[in-house]
């Protein structure tokens, strides 16, 4: 290779332009701009979102192109739009959810500057998927022949296309990039754009794959990756007339885009391109277009404030990913990923942990609740990238005179400073814009104002008859933590007239009676239904609700329900609304309609739980049936309907539980 490099003193911003492509990805865009902020190349953002991003448009040192019409176009048209503004000799393009490694870009530029015969250069890439607490990495590229330097374009085509390597994110001479992307007809399918791009670049000039880590590209998921890989493979492998015609069309496009190439012209050139596609088809007979095997899972170690990589059993050591400089770079990327979250998968996980943090840090009225410091440590362990959590933990530790706490406070303060240096935004505020956060804000807004709260409390004190609510709390797993969560929610609520009977398989913490606000009854799996029915007969509460340990009561739900029950003499049973804690930890409302027998029978797990049952009617109905231990409430409601029809079955539009 001949070296003609003379650009060592020319600023990188005059040598390389990075085109960042985005559409409705503001979080990814901000993260990408932060990642590349210290890399001194020229940056152009091409934004196809419906509305421009004013904050990004005003950033210094950045060219921002907003064109909403590009949303109706393909990849090539978007890149072509950005290329209009490129004045550097080299260009590279990436989606905003990718990370092109700066050192690799610089090395690729240096290689092309030193070797004029080469038009394109890149290294090897990984796939990644970010979660709230870890990042998974996937093999994407395979080890391939790395130098395609033949003087004959047809030889380069045959050799490179037989390797099936994407070049969409390679550093390319700007002239070649314009030559291709301005030639691609609108409406060309994405997979044909990628295949054509590969064929054009290797036909136009020599090509180099450097043995270095080059980029991270977000993993689209197994199904999406499989569909796209199948489209690529089908395009070059299928033998039906339509597929054959599409290949011939692409061959003509590649040859025409090359212009006056002396190597590939006319039918001879088209045959060379088709031969390259055939070589690609042969390659894809035995392997997928891109790999998808998970090779590393890197969890963020809260204690050490760094990434902790765990390797999968199968590795690909022939690839250049096993070196300390790369892992140092990945650690910096992971820090950014967690500090500036983006993408559906990560944001869904973040919503869950932010809900948990909000619950841990709410004001506690229960003197037996966990200490604030203990709850702050738990919140920090769930997600250590919330400024407010870090600050509150540091403040609380700072109050201690214990030497260990003082040392911990210093570490937490240093961590907070590191967060602040890269982003001043408090990620805990993201909850306000998420479904769970909006639901929690809505619940808070339903709290009675102080004057109304005083009025309701006075009203219930003066007219207690007929409105007192008792909770039958099942603790069949003897889980003290779940019990504590339920107790905390009751004590934090505005309702004070409740009585709770806990039916537990665990040891009794104290000797209590039904006259106490909190009464414990020892039960077994075989007799708890009978024990419940005994308590129902003796209880003094007017209304009873069956609940499970761990379910939490909203702050004002029981109070507002009790106030409604004062004048509900005609009601036999009342359904209430609920907030459901979903499997992923997020919250969703369950707003029940008025009583509907069809709904009750079709989805009893949703429609039959947490009814307020008038105690004397529960006794008259014979209590709960031990024949249906998994459907106690559903069976009871059906018997109440058999005895008295559907009259007196009501619904209260008030969320009473989070369950």
Predicted regions and their residues:
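Active-site donor/metal-binding and catalytic loop motifs
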Residues: 126-133, 168, 183, 204-241, ...
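Short, flexible, basic/aromatic active-site loop/helix in glycosyltransferases
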Residues: 140-162, 586-609
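Glycine-rich, basic loop-to-helix element that forms the pyrophosphate-binding segment
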Residues: 69-85, 523-539
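A short, conserved alpha-helix in the catalytic core of glycosyltransferases
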Residues: 176-180, 187-211, 617, 627-648, ...
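Short, acidic, metal-binding catalytic loop of nucleotide-sugar glycosyltransferases
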Residues: 34-42, 488-497
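Short aromatic/hydrophobic "clamp" motif used to bind/position activated sugar donors
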Residues: 91, 544
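Non-catalytic membrane-proximal stalk/linker segments that position and tether the catalytic domains
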Residues: 1-13, 282, 287-469, 474-481, ...
């Amino acid at each position: 290779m001949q070296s003609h490099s003379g650009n060592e003193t020319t600023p990188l911003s005059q040598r390389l332009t990075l085109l960042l492509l985005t559409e409705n990805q503001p979080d990814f865009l901000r993260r990408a701009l932060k990642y590349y902020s210290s890399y001194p190349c020229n940056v152009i953002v091409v934004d196809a979102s419906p509305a421009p991003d004013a904050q990004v448009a005003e950033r210094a040192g950045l060219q921002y192109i907003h064109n909403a019409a590009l949303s109706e176009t393909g990849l090539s048209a978007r890149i072509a739009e950005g290329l209009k503004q490129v004045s550097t000799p080299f260009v590279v393009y990436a989606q905003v959810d990718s990370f092109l490694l700066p050192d690799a870009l610089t090395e690729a530029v240096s290689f092309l500057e030193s070797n004029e015969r080469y038009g394109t250069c890149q290294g090897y890439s990984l796939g990644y998927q970010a979660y709230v607490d870890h990042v998974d990495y996937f093999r994407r590229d395979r080890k391939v022949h790395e130098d395609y330097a033949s003087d004959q374009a047809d030889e380069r085509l045959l050799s490179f296309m037989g390797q099936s390597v994407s070049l969409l994110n390679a550093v390319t001479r700007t002239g070649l990039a314009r030559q291709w992307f301005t030639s691609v007809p609108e409406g060309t399918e994405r997979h044909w754009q990628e295949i054509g791009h590969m064929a054009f670049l290797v036909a136009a000039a020599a090509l180099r794959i450097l043995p270095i880590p080059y980029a991270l590209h977000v993993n689209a998921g197994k199904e999406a990756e499989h569909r796209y890989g199948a489209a690529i493979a089908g395009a070059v492998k299928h033998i039906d007339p339509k597929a054959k015609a599409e290949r011939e069309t692409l061959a003509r496009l590649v040859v025409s885009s090359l212009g006056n190439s002396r190597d590939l012209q006319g039918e001879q050139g088209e045959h060379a391109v088709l031969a390259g596609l055939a070589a690609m088809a042969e390659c894809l007979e035995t392997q997928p277009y891109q790999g998808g095997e998970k090779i590393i899972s890197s969890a963020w170690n809260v204690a050490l404030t760094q990434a902790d990589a765990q390797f999968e059993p199968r590795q690909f050591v022939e690839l250049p990913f096993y070196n300390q400089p790369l892992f140092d770079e990945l650690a910096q990327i992971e820090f950014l990923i967690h500090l500036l979250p983006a993408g559906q998968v990560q944001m869904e996980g973040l919503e869950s942990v932010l809900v948990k943090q909000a619950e841990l840090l709410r004001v506690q009225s229960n003197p037996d609740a966990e200490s604030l410091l203990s709850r702050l440590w738990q919140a920090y362990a769930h997600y250590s990238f919330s400024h407010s959590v870090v600050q509150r933990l540091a403040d609380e530790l700072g109050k201690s005179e214990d030497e260990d706490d003082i040392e911990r406070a210093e570490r937490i303060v240093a961590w907070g400073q590191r967060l602040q240096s890269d982003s001043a935004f408090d990620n805990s505020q993201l909850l306000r814009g998420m479904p769970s956060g909006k639901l929690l804000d809505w619940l808070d807004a339903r709290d009675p104002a102080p004057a109304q709260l005083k009025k309701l409390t006075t009203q219930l004190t003066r007219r207690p008859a007929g409105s007192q609510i008792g909770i039958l709390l099942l603790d069949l797993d003897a889980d003290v933590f779940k019990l504590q969560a339920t107790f905390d929610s009751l004590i934090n609520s505005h309702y004070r007239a409740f009585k709770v009977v806990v039916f537990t398989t665990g040891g009794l913490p104290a000797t209590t009676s039904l006259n106490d606000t909190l009464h414990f009854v020892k039960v077994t799996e075989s007799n708890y239904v009978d024990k419940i029915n005994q308590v129902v007969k003796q209880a003094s509460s007017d209304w009873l609700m069956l609940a499970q340990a761990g379910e939490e009561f909203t702050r004002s739900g029981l109070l507002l329900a009790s106030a409604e029950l004062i004048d509900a003499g005609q009601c036999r049973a009342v359904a209430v609304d609920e907030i459901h804690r979903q499997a992923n930890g997020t919250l969703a409302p369950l707003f029940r309609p008025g009583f509907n027998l069809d709904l009750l029978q079709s989805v009893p797990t949703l429609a039959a739980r947490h009814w307020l049952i008038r105690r004397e009617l529960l006794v008259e109905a014979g209590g709960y049936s031990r024949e249906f231990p998994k459907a106690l409430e559903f069976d009871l409601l059906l018997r109440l309907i058999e005895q008295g029809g559907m009259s007196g079955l009501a619904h209260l539009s008030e969320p009473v539980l989070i369950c």
